[in-house]
Curated annotation (Swiss-Prot):
Its EC number is 6.3.5.3. GO terms for cellular component: cytoplasm. Gene3D superfamilies: 3.40.50.880, Phosphoribosylformylglycinamidine synthase, linker domain (1.10.8.750), PurM-like C-terminal domain (3.90.650.10), PurM-like, N-terminal domain (3.30.1330.10). The active site is at C1162 (nucleophile), H1287, E1289. In the N-terminal section; belongs to the FGAMS family. It is an enzyme of class 6 (ligase). Pfam families: AIRS_C, FGAR-AT_linker, FGAR-AT_N, FGAR-AT_PurM_N-like, GATase_5. The gene is purL. NCBIfam families: FGAM_synt, PRK05297.1. GO terms for biological process: 'de novo' IMP biosynthetic process. This is Phosphoribosylformylglycinamidine synthase.
Amino acid sequence: MEILRGSPALSEFRVNKLLERCRELDLPVSGIYAEFMHFADVSAPLNSDEQSKLASLLTYGPTIAEHEPTGTMLLVTPRPGTISPWSSKSTDIAQNCALGNVKRLERGTAYYVEVTADLTNAQLTDLKALIHDRMMEVVFTDVDSAAALFTQAEPAPVQSVDILVGGRKALEDANLKLGLALAEDEIDYLVENFTMLGRNPNDIELMMFAQANSEHCRHKIFNADWTIDGVEQEKSLFKMIKNTYEKNHEHVLSAYKDNAAVMEGSEVGRFFPNPESRQYNYHQEAAHILMKVETHNHPTAISPWPGASTGSGGEIRDEGATGLGGKPKAGLVGFTVSNLRVPGFEQPWETDFGKPGRIVNALEIMLEGPLGGAAFNNEFGRPNLLGYFRTYEEKVTSHNGEEIRGYHKPIMIAGGMGNIRADHVQKKEIPVGAKLIVLGGPAMNIGLGGGAASSMASGQSAEDLDFASVQRENPEMERRCQEVIDRCWQMGDANPIAFIHDVGAGGISNALPELVDDGERGGKFQLRNVPNDEPGMSPLEIWCNESQERYVMAVAPENLAVFEAICKRERAPFAVVGEATEERHLTLEDEHFDNTPIDMPMDILLGKAPKMHRDAKTLKVEGQAIDRSGIELEAATQRVLRLPAVAEKTFLITIGDRSVTGLVARDQMVGPWQVPVANCAVTAASYDTYHGEAMSMGERTPVALLDFGASARLAVGEAITNIASADIGDMKRINLSANWMSPAGHPGEDAGLYEAVKAVGEELCPALGLTIPVGKDSMSMKTKWEQDGEQKEVTSPLSLVITAFGRVEDVRKTVTPQLRTDKGESSLILIDLGCGQNRLGATALAQVYKQLGDKPADVDNPELLKGFFYAVQALVRDEKVLAYHDRGDGGLYVTLAEMAFAGHTGVEVDINTSESDACDDVLAMLFNEELGAVLQVRTEDLDTVKSVLAEHGLTACSHVIGTVVDEDVVRIWNGNDRVLEQSRTDLRTVWAETTYQMQAMRDNPAGALQEFEAKKDNSDPGLSAQLTFDINEDVAAPFIAAPFITKAPKTGASVVNAPAINLGAKPQMAILREQGVNSHVEMAAAFDRAGFEATDVHMSDILSGNVQLEGFNGLVACGGFSYGDVLGAGEGWAKSVLFNNIARDQFEAFFKRNDTFSLGVCNGCQMMSNLSELIPGSDLWPRFVRNESERFEARFSLVEVQKSDSLFFNEMAGSRMPIAVSHGEGRVEVRNGEHLNAIEQSGTVALRYLDNFGNVTQNYPANPNGSPNGITGLTTMDGRVTIMMPHPERVFRTVANSWHPDDWNENSPWMRMFRNARVNLG
């Protein structure tokens, strides 16, 4: 084993945060220094050249001052017997760098701890808990112990459970020991069936049965028979959901039978490479819409980052594994937790009711969980465009007496939408003899029993089992798998996939039987064919673990070679683990032990498990009206604005990429001031169309404490009032996902669940013409524990989260909450679907005063809601609405405030909508949460708007309440009485406090403070655009039609590599990607539009010699996470070029040709900056390292094009315009001041960050990474090679910009870059 010291692992502020945690735990720790330590398992001693190469490979990341470590060393490494994602990716890089003697690399972190007193054993345990993840890592106290990383344990054998002798008791004991969560009737069922088979079950068979039949997988409660108050009910919960489909399935193509639902999309030109030539082009066809929303509540409570991360990963796989392969497109996340209680920022309504030790608190969930969800989406390459965040934890008088209701078991929602080909919506048959394949990462001993564990109330399983049920993530692996699926579906009728499922709860023990069962087959499997990174695992652990990033599929034998070639090119691991059989029987053979751990008929596993029956009693609560005595209006506004459900959520948004794909038409951030208040998310269906897709969310969970049905109806209603801001057209074009969370079995809750499902499934949705083709249930939303000898429990309210998906006619017509002051005189209209009832039960106002209230808002008249939707749609389509915001948490007051924040303007309104001189209840008028919306319309259009509202029966509930004023004010009148006059800037600051506090705790506190202070500046002019060229001029047009001499790229022996002169021939553009790159398609689309022939080139094509760069005119290295950024962002990619002779020679020759050009964006920028020794004229280029915030930053940033020789920026110097930024490692790092001066004097700086005043800035977040002098793009001395961190390819279309001036047409100013490249070639 070779040992190599690495760079320091923690920045100064990270060390300070760790020391702060030590102080909180009363640990006598005075200092901490940490550095990476690398371990290499070699097959032979490395020679000096190999040692030098390896040392260079393992030198990466930002330069942090090193010092000789002192103090006690604690070495954190991956658990021996496991192989970490870092290890597999860095080993891949080493192999690609011709380091064949390196069998495996692994990394640890050495912490050197200085103490003021000896640590006790308990203190040492506490310290270790701060620095390692006990599921995945261990702590050693000496370096030599790390040799255990490369030792392999002997496989453990299968264990049988002796029911033939021990009877039922033996199975009961196994049930507890293995955490199977089997019900009493299931135990009887298994004893009976295995006795009939005349043999004992093996532990692997029992675990497989438990997973496949868990509540998580089988949805027993939703499929149960029901008796309520002694009356047998006609329908199960699921049948009532399916009723929506029976009543209306006009545009639904697949429901209830696959991993995601499918609805009709638009006919567009889908843009992807030809499977044969690998040249990108448009394919005119239907882009149908995938819909899925998952929950990952239990793992997120135990370990928030991996819990939320794998929740997002699992939902992405669901979309990819729909039909014969789908394409995930855009994501959403949501969190409901108990009170945050931010230290030093505790709020008056936040009481501490305690929690069990095995779960983390709400604050920890919200500091870590959103990062996990965002990180997976970011690295996979899916924009996260939508979400919600609610806190609730209160002692209330409910139908069960006084009890604590809250979310100690959190809700973690992960969802999204994608696209699928029309011919791939339905799965095929599995032919007998089909090869059964596992695609993706290796088996690891994690996530055991996840399906069963999540089906129990928190506290019913042992703590070790709870922790064992959490999975760990590797999104870069999932990206590789998705690339394989993409290559398959892009083959159309030749798609080799016959059947596909994702691997989720229960691992392959659930996925493979489900695969063959759905295909009406049996299966014969080989255990030792399963890719396995932990050889010491038992058969149960190999078969049942929930290692992530895996898919199972059936491929006909004649298509196997094609599939194998695709996997090899994408470097996606796969294995044939079995064959489909005619007989519906399941066999698993283990050649290591020469036995058969599983041998059972399919119908015992999946066919005849007992059906559940639920007997429920209705319990209702009579709430008390809100006590107004302690509520003062001004103070109430401050409290409500600080409630997390209302408060600004920037800390949850800027950590997530919102521009990848180049198809995002509406993200959360609105207007020139980028305020996170969008009503819904919108994407374009492709790059050649304005058709698209929209999604919105709705949830009002505290209302269920007063009225189960009202809570469910409001969730649907809110999703509709949100999505109404997009151009949908027909309401039947909207489909819903319903995610149900319930503390099943809690008094009154079962009947309440039935009432809520009936309210939407049998009543509201059929009345509106809406379908619920997809959803999920989580039926164990309760946490129990013992504290100080007292039994405690926190029970969640019944929680329905609705997500609405809709096809969009024209994405340009989406209306945001941004109030406009540049459109002439305007009026504000309130549409009040509560029709003046102004009910305050379970509102934000009630919550911040620790009350519940009596009557909540409701959907009393479905026809009124339908009329509202169609009226707003008519106004949106005719462009009669300047701004739109639905009324939700915080009521009318918050709606108006958020619209003012987005428009950076003032509002003046009169809330008296009655016939009398004044409204008789100001508090209720301002803070009720009845459904509705506020519209800003031109005063000249007011009569037209009123006419449309009247046509849809809305006259009685529509009121002109005020206007926009060009002042820093929110001024509210009640008739002639001015009841509130507040500074909008002050309110904006209050609204931002929660996000600031969370950012300061989680990220670099200095940057968080800078961002918070910037929000206090009322003089901030917001984003703007000033161009030095004509945005509408297509400078490339004359060249696209002219003759062009091109040399066809060498992409294999079949291509004739001869010069040809073709009229209108296109220059050849290599769209270069490495494993983990995710921004290549939008890059190809931009160059294609500029007149290039864009070709998909994978690094594996170059390393294999299948593609030669000499045939290309241009080369672009694209953005993403090559190798998961394990050896520094872009550095592993660069070193696989520098240290591989085949690749090095090709790149060096290409860069030296004077008839080529190159571009590196984001990850490609980082990669090319590390190739400077091969690129003439790039000697001064800096490195790009971790952002100063130490956080992934997704911003819409203002930049200025500098005067340089870059061919891309010809005639663009001096132009200022916003651009998408998405990176975690974009900070320019120079060697010293002299290096920086040399860069500045060389004239190679091409782009700089500006603040909104037009000044070059280093201030956060206008400069999102802290680069000196705002530098974010550079070029070579001759201008042929340009590198930049921002993403012009994601915003080349105007509609893809988060904000843009109204006079921009189809192409944004960034299109000029790509056209300049075409002009340069002549």
